[in-house]
Amino acid sequence: MEPITDQPMDQPKQKVKIPCNHMLLYIHLTQSYSYCAVCNGDYGLCYYCSRCNFQAHSECIEWPDTIDHPSHSRHPLKKVSPGTIDYTDGKCHFCREELVDPMYHCSLCNFSIDVNCWRHPPQRTIYQPKSHEHTFTLMPRKITFTCNACGMLGDCNPYFCFECGFMLHKDCIDLPRVININRHDHRISRTYHLGHGDWGSCGVCRKEIDWSLGAYSCKRCPNYAVHSKCAIREDVWNGEELEDVPEEEEEIEDPYKVVNDKEIIHFCHEEHNLRLGGDDDVTGYEKMLCDACITPISSDPFFKCVQCEFFLHKVCASLPRRKRNIMHTEKLDLQVTKAGEYNKCISCRKIFDGFRYCSRFEKFDVRCGSISEPFHHELHPHPLYHILSAAEKLKLCGACGKYLHYVLSCTVCEFNLGMDCATLPRKVRHICDAHDLSLHHVPGNSKGQQLWCDSCEGKLDPSVWFYGCDDCGSTLHIKCVLGDFNHLKPGKKYGEAELVVNDGMTRLFCISCKKRCSFPSFLKATCPNTLCEQRWGFPSFLKAASPDSFVLFACSMDCAYDKYFMLWFYEVDY
């Protein structure tokens, strides 16, 4: 907006009143942002109204020297600067924001408010019959109380119900009454008093619930309850109030149709029937991969296509087409990755193919998308839960030693398990050993021993999990056994690169790390010489047997992002 004044420099600075009654922001003026509407200055701190596009320095605004405030009627409040008073806590009595210049203060009562709480005083009374049958009255004073709605402590300005003896935070009066959360299949409703009962722990944070305080409870599940603040967390609730919205049972289409006792038609492979494999069918198929989870068929019950090489574990064939997930607030839909495409799981950060659970913006592979609470792992004695507070951005995974965002945590001990480690196959096969390898970890009192990987012959950190053979005593790094591409299907092309099983007589050189690939699979891309040599300047050692092309190999995801290889292995949308 245009400057309100344009006075000469030798005249006293004029001041203006704020031309609106909207909430103000206290921001830094910069040349790229705007200028003061009074003095035309483009630097310093100013008050800004986003609705009116008005901004002005505090010293350019005409503020009253004293004010009367309805929440402090005993004494007038005087305009002062925060730096002139050293006995306050530096925060506004009502909104608890940091006080800035100017503030209004009563020295007799040590009562301070900011400009917004002077111009927009809090409501003295609040009556919301849907929330409570009585009127709540503001107590504008510093007083320690326990909120009857959320169970959290407050230190000032509670709203009080004289008839019931309730004290609430102002924000807790407006808590939604009926909601859905991603930790429970049914709706939960707010109550100010749970009442006696075996409520156990909160369904989100897993801490104890006080039956005498407010919470959310499920009408269908008599002992299920969630703390009020836990239920409305951004990572738990999608923000939709469901009061007065009819609850209708969602009809989710079955993933397959039954043809007979042995055959089905699955939605992802409707062109052919899938037949249930018997015990005699396992031989010869144990190395085949399930097209849903991209793990070996092994000895698990499975379906196989009667006409083509398509396999599904029986468990994967029964995956629901729509479900809730503890890591997302919306329901996820089961989809099939199209040929030539690949995904990156938002929780375990792995590149994957096969089935995926998707929302509008995020993708989960079926392993992470199928995790539910409580989660039990054979290498940990206690159940695990997805617990994350706002202050805990990253947690240390006890399996791989990395700090991760999406983890499953133990409420008994301080153990955390990342999603990638939680979904590791319990048993695998490797060329280094004739037996099945199983997941292992070294007990705390034995972690001083030195272990070596039988694949790469490097040291193996005993503080992290590894694969080992109980018969031979062999030990291997998890990455040496699985590699980075264990969630992709060998033989398929991703972009212009093909995933190839590393079962040749010799190990090939990687384009990036310049080492021979020791992992179970690698990416291979062929580039025409005319393009590679002239435009990209590929080194001569990359030439294949054919004089007309280069062949590139990448042994890991880090190597796949090499400046040469990235041309052929397209990056994933994060």
PLM regions and their residue ranges:
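Cys/His-rich zinc-coordinating "finger" modules and their low-complexity flanking regions
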Residues: 1-574
